[in-house]
């Protein structure tokens, strides 16, 4: 039964542990605790009298677990009933019998669950059940000891005599017997709680004044198997009493218990006598000494105590019977012989190998090879080995001399991990950078004036010439080399800054067009050289990239000046021009004289952005002084594109070329000078900032309409915000535009031209929700509703004006 609440009272002294801490050592086991747990699983069969050995298997699982960790167990069993516990044993026996009868009655009524619970409480461990476990343990070479009376005293004796280094039990009485180390609540994995006697000082409730003797007194006063406690006295009150009392005579302290605790308690003489018997039972209970093979008291008798007067602590039956009882050869109740085990006889059957508790466990053979406690040459404490946590120390070398040579000494060191050697070790840093960079151009010095088509041999020779020539030749990355030279060959035919991979077409179309127009444009090239050379340094810089492109595409042509190109000047103006369509390019090439005439007309224009102004169409302003003079407004589509893109050649169908040069001159002279200067500045800013117009807009015949002075021109809302993109026609919903019936124009986005931005395209082709309101009082320059992207309803007066003008 133990002492109620003792483990919780001294929990500060307990600590978790694992049984492998005692590897190579010996532990004593209270086997009846395992038997009771194992019998709970087969309580119904035991109550019915059916044969079963489940309790044996349960106990052997713990034995195998201890052996697997290298711990040698000694199984200790209870012997005869102690005279001091006759009352306790009698009450327990009556309680078990009552539960058994109740369980049988519930089983007859069909209440199986309630009956099983009653059978569990009625479990009684018989000597025959203990003997079955002893036989199974002997097959594994495990020593077993049957105590003369109680197993608690026998366990304490084995621990005190250093035969067992620890005790495994579920009973807290072991601490009162004076055990040094007790393992409680151990599971099948070997985990449990360990309480050491030297750690009891950690408990704040006990304090430092407690000794082993006072601890035993406290356990007896709080109630134990040998004496029931007084009413209202537990561990707390008993501990308080012993801390307050300074008298070494415990009997006098017990008599004055009410005064110390300030309680109305009367201590009878029977209680004081029972306290004395209980204390002597804890001290002088009979046990069996396996080394001397004698029955001895737990502690030696003092001189003032008569052993015959301690019959309540056990009766000595003699050393011979005590040995046979300890070996398990005699029945403890009838004292009849049930077995003939002789530890001195040689074992004919080797012990069975213990079972491992897991896949990774290896059974330690040191536990089974240790000498038995029944052998003649057994010495207590010889099986105690060093703790596994403490490393094995080498023998001391003090006073010893030895010559040590360090010549062949190889110190342990971390080997540096060497990466696998690269196959392409002859590559230089520049070659590696060139292979993994996309925008870097490397031009090798050309020794020949003309370039030959690249072949495999030429590629290898050029690679050896440009790359690193030092070191032996090793295989290189063929794929990187081929891609590198392919990129170099393509650099001569296309410009990286203006090439669009989304809108570009095959370069073969442009190359064929240029080859067909070489002979026709030879004369125009000479006139263009003279004209462009006068334009200044800005124009030469703009034409520098087309010159490189011409040198690579036409190696057989004679070297040209840095500012010339095989294309018309309007096409080769770098990022400030739009090449237009292939159809328009053919027109400009087929009429070189007309292009040269237009260029000579603006030869006196300053350099820079003003040079590009010569390609800009000035919008004509009508002077109403002459009644017969009138100019056409902007065309429905394409006129604004032609005016905003200086690089595009003028179309023959546009309204701009439908007027004679004399009429244009007279109209321009009649314009207001202030408005003309302001508008010219605005056009210059638009020309320099606006992107190239879309080449997909098809040019339609111009509709000649006269501009009315009554219509006010929409103010520029984005003058301070950079370039404004003006559209050539009102914005229309996607998919509603009528597709042209003629041949689709060829997109020539690969030619150098200013790239359009997404924000500009959104501003140009998106719907405008609120159309600007026209003020009747504000007068301004007339505008075209189509050209300014303003949708207006034509009133009746406007229609009449248009009719009169026509």
UniProtKB/Swiss-Prot annotation:
One of its GO terms (cellular component) is nucleus. Residues 651-670, 686-696 have a biased composition (Low complexity). Residues 412-425, 592-601, 676-685 have a biased composition (Basic and acidic residues). Belongs to the XPG/RAD2 endonuclease family. EXO1 subfamily. Pfam families: XPG_I, XPG_N. Residues 337-426, 443-475, 512-754 are annotated as: Disordered. This is Exonuclease 1. SUPFAM superfamilies: 5' to 3' exonuclease, C-terminal subdomain (SSF47807), PIN domain-like (SSF88723). Mg(2+) 1 binds at residues 30, 78, 150, 152. The gene is exo1. Residues 138-229 are annotated as: I-domain. Its cofactor is Mg(2+). Its EC number is 3.1.-.-. It comes from the Eukaryota. GO terms for biological process: DNA recombination; mismatch repair. It comes from Danio rerio.
